[in-house]
Amino acid sequence: WTAARFTLMNLEIEENKLPAKDKLQLEDKWILSKYNSLVAEVTNNLDKFELGIAVSKLYDFLWSNFCDWYIELVKPRLFDKENPTRETAEYVLCYVLSGTMQLLHPFMPFITEEIWQHLPHEGESIMISRFPVYDKALDFAEDEKTMEAVMKAVSGIRNRRAEMNVPPSKKSKVIVVTKDTKTYNNSKQFFEKLASANEVEVLPDKEGIDSKAVNIVVDGAEIFLPLEELVDKDKELERLNKEKKQLEGEIKRVEGKLNNKGFVSKAPQKLIEEEKAKGIKYREMLEKVLESINDMENL
């Protein structure tokens, strides 16, 4: 409902249609390709009466692809009345949301009808509208792969900044080292909007990059973040060492239990397995904390 409300608030178009292919931006092709795959998968699930799987795929698409990514990616275009690609974003938003409501209608008839009625449409009811079908013309496999590489880079930056307690309000330079310079030069706006970048530099090699810059490796690229000026090094090291001490204490406690013959012989197997799982989790957490300490000390 929130996604529908956002879409409706930003629509000025009066019909539901797809724009010409040459007007589609990378993020448009990505969401259309993901939606097209969803149509094929859900149709196949319905044919096999795999209703639970169909609903799960619809849920994942709406939240993970449409809401979490596409809407965020196109906000700059929608909010800029002078942007020549604004109308294209509107058409794609409407097309994908309308089609997803049709796919979801068998499971949620009332709310999907209500949303569909507020979108540009043909016909009296979603119930008698043409059910979406797979369209080979919307198979943008290469563009989908390219967009997802950029998304992984954005996610990697956000995760690393979060690990180092750098708030989104503190902007930093982002340096991308990649052979695919064209893709990343054309994607700078995504890093500025979604990864708190105030400058994006795309380079073919690492020459001249500060050795203290934090690096993130993703498929096809290596990202460098010069975060030294944005982090209170002493305060962050104090926090990380405190967390390290707590985790080491938890690991010692778990190991003590599991090495206690009395506990192992008397405790239910389920409880023993739970303690083993805790030990694995704490060791993984400790490994990440140690990596963060190492990164911080090298700043």
Q: What are the roles of these predicted feature ranges?
A:
Residues 1-299:
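Feature 926 captures the class I aminoacyl-tRNA synthetase adenylation module centered on the KMSKS loop
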